């Protein structure tokens, strides 16, 4: 069995870890960084850039550079959270045929968020393969604890498109607890994991216990907000900068994608700087221009101002903490330790708010950027048998049930139920002689079905006609360890049964996934060909440069006919380099190498000939000296 890698697929950054010698290890990417920006860009020449390379060119290619797509994964275009983002990102968010939120490139090509995420996962997969020296096909991928079924399914689909068999979907706070608690001694304890990442927020209350020599991690309760994170903090800074500039110059920068991308980068930098300093300056020369000429943005931002801008966001993260504690039946004094996860928790105001709520300082010995990936790797190690004596008991974050008469949401599995789990309930018909029922599966906490997330609808036909209320329809829910739901409905009299693995009404169909897998494979081949083309061009450029230098140095010493041949070969190679035919470039390179070799040989021969001619007058003297030395040696022997 090969390695099962652990991947933290983050909104802003992603991280990869493996188990090595029984311990988790974060693997650096090809740029030498321990985290990779979750950014994918499509260039004009068709190249796909991922990570730091995509981030570097974002300012000059804003409409084709996609970031924070995790906020869109598994969501409908009409969702309020998606609508809120429409004018705040420089790229286009569009509606797919099934109502899902997709993105589109500047030339109109539509892409599913799963496809974008798959590009990031592919980079993680390649990083692992380069490090391990073997093929990697299996992974544990983390998701926010508060992700619903659609979002979990979509994340698995992204893994599949990237060529990964996702062995387990694991909640981010639970993964962080695994990374933190695996080697810790000190008996049973309850911890709170406060996870404020780039795009999502979760809090989980977890009990770590020793049971018969086995370390057990049991999630007691979880809560959160899948649309609250560092991106929202950045947006507050962007809005402030835009409003200040508008007041000063009368120009709204929101309408300029290029300016918006520059503002995003500057806002993120300013926010990070203010975690360690009291004041920073946002300086963006030539941010825009009007009839009077170019305009420059120069605004001072203090830590106090930033904290005022995001105060409600920080407070918004505390309410889920209160709910999670209440669901777990605990008080803040029952929590022994608080762990911070996610880059946004580096902000002093966030740390203070958490300390004030829980009544204790959060721990600082957990790396907020790496803990989740390490936990995913540990879970992979458990599944592969590399890590022993660890039991993870996670929960479902939201209640699951069906719509019943009058539009009521009837819960079958309550939120915070330990998974995997099964539950069933018996229902009946609403009308006399009814021969079929529609089972509408929902997820959420509202009493009215229409306010909850619709996961699936299916029909159970073949019910024996009878007066209303008499038929007995048993509806069973089965949640697997990934938090993914299977539902069945059975007529207890006829034993007619209908089973479904819940595939959200949104999400990708099998044929779409297969097409994307094929596209990804083709793209991998394209990438390989592109790399080969670049190598051929680079070799040709080096050859052109060295040959031009040789002509400059030796051109006057060799025949005009040879120089003519070299110049002709040079021109042919320079023309080939401008094209995309690797074979042509290599063939012309070979021709130039051969004539350049002739040039080198001719120049060397000419040099030797000149050297021989210059030394002819002194050759006799040299011979005499040699003979004299030879004679003297002979004379000595006599």
From Swiss-Prot:
Q: What CDD domains does the entry give?
A: ASKHA_NBD_HSP70_DnaK-like
State what induces this protein: By stress conditions e.g. heat shock.
| Keywords, comma-separated and alphabetical | ATP-binding, Chaperone, Nucleotide-binding, Phosphoprotein, Stress response
Q: Where is this region: Disordered?
A: 599-623
Q: Which GO terms describe its molecular function?
A: ATP binding; ATP-dependent protein folding chaperone; unfolded protein binding
Disulphide bridges: none
Q: In the record, which positions carry Phosphothreonine?
A: 200
Composition-biased stretches (Low complexity): 609-620
Question: What domain of life?
Answer: Bacteria
What biological function has been recorded for the protein in this entry? Answer: Acts as a chaperone.
Write out the similarity annotation.
Answer: Belongs to the heat shock protein 70 family.
| Stored HAMAP family | DnaK
Recorded protein name is Chaperone protein DnaK
